[in-house]
Structure formats: structure tokens, C-alpha cells
């Protein structure tokens, strides 16, 4: 009778611990869930638009310049 009561108490303790933690305590974490350590690999930081990029200097070379409107005269329409 006493052994059965101890086994039931241990089982109840084990079930309550696994319900709180979500997984059994002896299993190592496999790393497939979203944890704080792996969140930084999922989200890329935003870069500034005006900062130097990998191809931004070459893009400036080939961009067509806007005409200056200060010396052009009246608009045609």
C-alpha cells in the first residue's frame, strides 16, 4: 500500500513537472523551436537607405541626371 502511494506521488510529480515545462526534463532541447537565441537568424536588421551599399556607387554612375528647370523657360503645357 505504501509503495503504491509513493509510485502515485512520484507519477503525479513527474506529470505536473512535464506539464509546466512542456517537455520531459531528461530530453535535451533539439533547437527546432523558436528560442531567443535563434530569433536573430530569422530576422534581418534593416539597413539605412542612404548608407553605402554593395552596388550603390555603381548605380549612381548610370543614373540619368534630372534636367535643371531653373534656366529652361516656361513649361510647354
From Swiss-Prot:
One of its GO terms (molecular function) is identical protein binding. Transmembrane segments: none annotated. Residues 46-77 are annotated as: Disordered. It is found in: Secreted; Secreted, Extracellular space. Induction: Not up-regulated following myocardial infarction (MI) (at protein level). The keyword Transcription regulation does not apply. Disruption phenotype: Mice heart of embryos show increased coronary vessel growth at 13.5 dpc and 15.5 dpc. Double knockout mice of APELA and APLN genes exhibit the same penetrance, embryonic lethality and cardiovascular malformations as single APELA knockout mice. Knockout mice do not show significant differences in their hypertrophic response compared to wild-type mice. This is Apelin. It comes from Mus musculus. The lineage of its organism: Eukaryota, Metazoa, Chordata, Craniata, Vertebrata.
